[in-house]
Design a protein with these regions (language model features):
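Membrane-spanning alpha-helical segments of multipass transporters and channels
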Residues: 4-211
Length: 211
């Protein structure tokens, strides 16, 4: 043959389940956040709070802890029951915790900002993320609108990050981690500001159409 070719794998994907895992892990963490905010009181005794920051700290310490545990349980369960074999084991757990904390920061922000309307927005936002994250098929096969919104979807970076830790042994997650740390910081700051507003004026910033 006039041409010599060589084959080199850049990732290790053992089966379809491992290929789909990054997508469904992102969905699982997001749904866990939505379920938590539906059950956990986000405003109880806020009139007694000294400041928005202290009130946020009392709440955030709980929801971050809950999502950290949920992320660890998710990875552990997949490894035990579904034979998930991450190429970067420690980073898989760390990244899952960071993603969970970022998503709960985002979900609680929309919930306290918009109330019941926020819960509906969160559901719509999840559907948009499902289409725009390219979690199942290559982005090039998606419609133009999904290619446009792709860089702005949190699932885009969680799917990419989970793909790296599950299938690529020597790939950095610095970019994805910076994205989610940024989400945590921005959403937390906005949440503190909203709590400050609620302490001074006990009404939602956005009027509720369903009350």
């Amino acid at each position: 043959s006039p041409v010599d070719t060589s084959h080199k794998e850049i990732s290790i994907v053992e089966n379809n389940g491992q290929g789909m895992a990054p997508y469904m892990m992102s969905v699982g963490l997001y749904v866990a956040c939505m379920a938590f905010t539906l059950m956990y009181p986000l405003f109880n005794d806020i009139e007694k709070a000294e400041s928005g920051f202290k009130y946020w700290l009392s709440k955030a310490s709980i929801w971050f802890a809950v999502l950290a545990v949920a992320a660890i349980l998710m990875i552990g369960s997949l490894m035990i029951f579904c034979n998930l074999n991450p190429q970067q084991l420690l980073m898989t757990f760390i990244f899952a915790v960071i993603v969970g904390c970022a998503l709960i920061a985002l979900v609680t922000l929309l919930s306290i900002l918009c109330g019941k309307i926020g819960e509906f927005i969160l559901l719509v936002f999840m559907v948009i993320n499902l289409g725009g994250s390219a979690g199942t098929y290559p982005l090039e096969t998606s419609s133009t609108i999904y290619q446009i919104i792709h860089p702005f979807m949190p699932f885009t970076y969680s799917v990419n990050g989970f793909r790296k830790v599950l299938s690529m042994p020597n790939v950095s997650l610095n970019y994805e981690i910076m994205i989610f740390v940024g989400i945590i910081v921005v959403c937390s700051l906005l949440t503190v500001l909203i709590y400050n507003h609620r302490i001074k004026k006990p009404t939602l910033l956005i009027p509720q159409a369903f009350e």
